[in-house]
Amino acid sequence: LFFFLNRTCFNGLYRVNKSGLFNVPFGRYETPTICDANTIFADSELLQKVEILTGDYTQTINYAKGNSFFYFDPPYRPLNATSSFNDYTKEAFNDLAQKRLKDFCDQVQGAGHYFMLSNSDCQDGFFDDLYMQYQIERVWASRSINADPRKRGKLTELLIRNYN
């Protein structure tokens, strides 16, 4: 079902409302490829060595070994008051959740692991202040999802990491 929704909904977006119900409109695809056999077999082969976990991300530290690498791609913080969408699940990923993620990054750092995090470049200094002891890099990224088509395109986002 996930593959069908991913291939047929607007820009492959997955999102639910506060009741936990899927709420993405249909995409405008004439002949979407729902299932490509070669890709499925290749993915299956790669996933043979992968353990997929369900639960709170903070529990992943229990599976880290040696110098593990963590990549975090949370719901991005809104760029301004009018771009307030950041809820892909029924639980909001607000500033408190962003700070909780930063605390977990500190835990990852303290355990001797590496991390990289991507997020929006809000221009209000929120992430610059929150992650001041880490490396913060601004990079150009293309965005294709926005309610206002004129606001789609390139903008800067942040890459935050604990290594050079």
Task: Describe the residue ranges of each PLM region.
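Class I S-adenosyl-L-methionine
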Residues: 134-164
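A generic structural signal for short, non-catalytic loop/turn and secondary-structure boundary residues
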Residues: 45, 129-132, 153
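Short glycine-enriched, charge-decorated loop/helix-capping segments at active-site entrances
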Residues: 85-92
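Conserved phosphate-coordination/catalytic loops
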Residues: 34, 51, 92-99, 151-154
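Conserved Class I SAM-dependent methyltransferase catalytic core
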Residues: 97-142
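Short glycine-/acidic-enriched loop or helix-start segments at secondary-structure transitions
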Residues: 81-82, 126-127, 148
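A residue-level signal for conserved active-site and pocket-lining positions in enzyme catalytic cores
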Residues: 3, 115, 160
